[in-house]
Amino acid sequence: MEAALDLFAAHGVTGTSLQMIADHMGVTKAAVYHQFHTKEDIVLAVIGPALETLTKVADAADRQRAHRRRLESALNGIVDLIIKNRRLTAIVQFDPMVAELVRAHPSRTSIERIRGMFTGADPDASALVSAAMVSGGLVMAGIDPALDGLSDEELRRHLFDTAWRLLKPRTASLSASGGRVAQPTGRV
């Protein structure tokens, strides 16, 4: 799958032929066809693990009782996913064929659940804009070559902290006992 990902990243899905994948892998086109019947099958094999992770992120966040904890959990999971899949993130976000496959994939409901965690219940315009900016910003930061010099942990911390400032729950910042609630710093 790395061979296909390399080619998708360089040429886009539409610009990558099965013959190119076969050549890159050092096998025949027939061997690729034997394993995968269509290019869509290859794309789904490449993006499938990340989509499964999205579902796990949404499920883990849903298990949290408080909205703030759900938001932290979802944001940590998304940041980790982006850092681990930088090349894939760009393909999923910007390739029209991949975007179409993602829209039709069962994990789409998980994406919507995470978006709901980012916006909160009954979101106003500010919450919707914040969620859109965070979603797009996380993707762009994950593929920005200017950030290649940052370690994964440093990038993780900055992505989480910056996104948190935009998404912070719009609930009171005092706990039920009257004390201040500590702001998260990137890991739960």
Model regions and ranges:
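Solvent-exposed, amphipathic alpha-helical segments
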Residues: A3, L7-A10, T53-A60, G137-A141
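Short alpha-helical functional segments enriched in proximate histidine and acidic residues
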Residues: L7, L81, L166
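Helix-turn-helix
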Residues: A3, L7-D41, A45
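Short amphipathic alpha-helical/adjacent loop interface patches that line ligand
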Residues: F36, L51, L75
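Hydrophobic alpha-helical connector segments
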Residues: D41, A45, K56-A90
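Hydrophobic/aromatic-rich alpha-helical bundle segments in the mid-to-C-terminal region
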Residues: R69, T89-A90, F94, E100-V188
